């Protein structure tokens, strides 16, 4: 499985990718993109490149629910048929504090913490489904 952890913010997002079986990472540290369509396209291109390089098409994306800042990127990812998992930030914070993942907190490490949490708990997480309102 390719796990993608995204740390969501108002103006930018940081993401980290790892192939869970081999431990191969896309980059040594997180990649930063702007919170706009061109940033989302870069993320999509990087995911596709990493998937092609590893031969792994099982892609799961995890991000924390943070106000409204995740709304547009989730819509983009779902439109491109990615499996997106919304993770409660309290759970990733608890994992960080328990010592199972990095104990520091910064944007670069946050995406790695989310990625690790996604790998460790992938069987318990369910994909995000948009809320549909009917009249």
Q: Language model features by range: what are they?
A:
Residues 1-135:
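Phosphate- and other anionic-substrate recognition elements at nucleic-acid/protein interfaces
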């Amino acid at each position: 499985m390719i796990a993608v952890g995204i740390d969501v913010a108002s103006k930018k997002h940081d993401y980290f990718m790892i192939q869970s079986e081999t431990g191969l990472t896309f980059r040594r540290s997180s990649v930063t993109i702007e919170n706009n369509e061109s940033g989302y396209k870069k993320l999509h291109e990087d995911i596709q490149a990493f998937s092609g390089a590893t031969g792994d098409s099982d892609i799961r994306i995890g991000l924390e629910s943070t106000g409204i800042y995740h709304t547009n990127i989730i819509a983009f990812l779902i439109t491109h048929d990615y499996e997106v998992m919304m993770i409660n930030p309290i759970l990733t914070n608890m994992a960080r504090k328990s010592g199972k993942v990095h104990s520091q907190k910064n944007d670069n490490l946050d995406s790695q913490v989310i990625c690790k949490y996604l790998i460790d708990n992938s069987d318990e997480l369910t994909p995000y489904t948009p809320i549909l309102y009917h009249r």
